[in-house]
Regions:
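Short alpha-helix in the alpha/beta-hydrolase fold that links the catalytic acid
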Residues: 161, 175-184
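Acidic catalytic loop of the alpha/beta-hydrolase fold
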Residues: 169-174, 201-202
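Gly/Ala-rich beta-loop-alpha elbow adjacent to hydrolase catalytic centers
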Residues: 71-76, 80
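Short, surface-exposed "cap/lid" segments of acyl-processing enzymes
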Residues: 1-30, 34-36
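Alpha/beta-hydrolase active-site loop
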Residues: 42-63
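Hydrolase active-site cap/lid region
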Residues: 86-145
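Short beta-strand/loop motif that positions the catalytic acidic residue
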Residues: 158-160, 165-167, 171
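Catalytic histidine-centered segment of alpha/beta-hydrolase-like enzymes
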Residues: 198-212
């Protein structure tokens, strides 16, 4: 789920996965209001929260799972991308589905700062605070956030997992430009499904049928199953 949401957000995907024969595990992560807080009680934009995704995979493995498909909304997408590039369990991830994801935090923060008319020098100073250990006295974070490590447009070449990426061009909170850039850089592994008119993480609300069909078709291809033809 995304920042500010909880594990109810992914409920909309459970029927699609169930129909495809997949079990679902809806997780919470630190500081989301359900899971225990971190020591500083601050979001790290995915730079640490991915460890909770890793813990959930271990939980699933202990109960019989052998492979995993990750799905993440918004910041949850950033967690999934960190997991597949940093965890020793990444080899068990068969695929990733991203709905309105943050694939580059600098791009998103720049956009939001622009909406708020925050001057460029102040933005730069804020990024330096977030990314440095000494900035913790101002940010309240217990550790620096590595914003470069969260940029998967720059790190596109490092990705190796089949990915379904869905984003709306009408998303005014996390613009689709980053997702489009990633898809353009990695057409070998990224299947990009654009939407128009949907707000942030509202693809299902806007066109649930198309959203569900995109996931079903992609999972069928991943599983090597011929999907049923649409009526």
């Amino acid at each position: 789920h995304g920042r500010g949401a909880d594990r109810r957000e992914p409920l909309r995907a459970v029927p699609v996965f169930h129909e495809a024969g997949h079990s679902s595990l809806l997780i919470s992560y630190r500081n989301d209001g359900v899971a225990p807080n971190s020591k500083d009680g601050r979001y790290a934009l995915g730079d640490t929260e991915w460890e909770d995704v890793e813990a959930s995979i271990r939980f699933a493995l202990a109960r019989g799972a052998t492979q995993v498909v990750l799905m993440g909304w918004s910041m949850g997408g950033a967690l999934a991308l960190q997991l597949i590039t940093r965890s020793p369990l990444a080899e068990l991830v068969r695929g990733v589905i991203l709905d309105s994801p943050v694939v580059d935090w600098i791009r998103v923060l720049d956009h939001q700062a622009g909406v708020l008319r925050i001057p460029g020098p102040i933005r730069t100073a804020a990024y330096q605070l977030i990314g440095s250990g000494w900035g913790s006295r101002f940010t309240g974070q217990s550790a620096a956030i590595n914003l470069a490590r969260l940029d998967f447009v720059a790190r596109a070449a490092e990705l190796a997992v089949p990915t379904l990426l869905m984003h709306s061009d009408a998303d005014t909170f996390v613009p689709s430009a980053g997702s489009r850039a990633l898809a353009d850089l990695r057409p070998d592994i990224v299947t990009y499904v654009p939407f128009a008119g949907a707000g942030h993480t509202r693809l299902w609300n806007y066109d649930g049928k198309r959203w569900g069909q995109a996931i079903s078709s992609w999972i069928s291809e991943l599983d090597g199953v011929t999907p049923p033809s649409s009526p």
